[in-house]
Amino acid sequence: MSPIQEQLTALGGVFLAAVLVDRIAKTGQVSEAALSCMLGSLLIRDPKDTLEVYGGDDINLREGYRALIGALERDPSTLQREPLRYALSMLGLERQLAKRDDLLETIGKRLPQIQSQVEHFGPAHENVIAACGGLYQDTLSTLRQRIQVHGDMRNLQQPSNASKIRALLLAGIRSARLWRQLGGHRWQLVISRRKLLKELYPLMRSS
């Protein structure tokens, strides 16, 4: 993978989280494999490459890549507006989080506890989802900027769906942080669209 493709893999994680949040909000449904991929990404430390963060291959990132391609191509027929809004909001929240050492410390202390739950129950277990959602509430929900999720109120009011949405937003912001660490910047999404798409199309085909 090229350095830009490493960035795009992490950005695909942001967009996958956004797509899954939108799907839960509108339908109440989510793929367990995709959910496990994103929640698992919270717990990987010192990966040998970006792909390892998402389980070693990018098959679960396809929907994230597709939404990212739609955003970069700016084609109204393929643009997923709500996921794009969520993804950009996650990139913005990551910038705010980076300035808050206290919140980063809280996240750093509680992720090992969640890791213990994953080892006991598995990554998509309701206890793990609730713990991740609670961590989001205690940290990122306290920031000035909030992510407003739109969908069917019947889905949004179910506690299990609310926990999944918060857990996915936490995982998406983790991917946004990884994207920044790999050299990603928001201006690239405007200025370097064609360059990004050229590197992204092969990822979409191979995943």
From Swiss-Prot:
- UniProt cross-references to InterPro entries, sorted A to Z: HflD, HflD-like_sf
List the SUPFAM superfamilies hit by this protein, alphabetically: YcfC-like (SSF101322)
Is Cell inner membrane set as a keyword in this record?
yes
Q: Which cysteines are joined by disulfide bonds?
A: none
What is one term from the GO cellular component aspect held by the record?
A: plasma membrane
Q: Which UniProt keywords apply?
A: Cell inner membrane, Cell membrane, Cytoplasm, Membrane
Where is this protein found?
Answer: Cytoplasm; Cell inner membrane
Q: How does it sit in the membrane?
A: Peripheral membrane protein
Reply yes or no: does the keyword Ribosomal protein apply. Answer: no
Instruction: Tell me the protein family, please.
Output: Belongs to the HflD family.
This one is known as: High frequency lysogenization protein HflD homolog
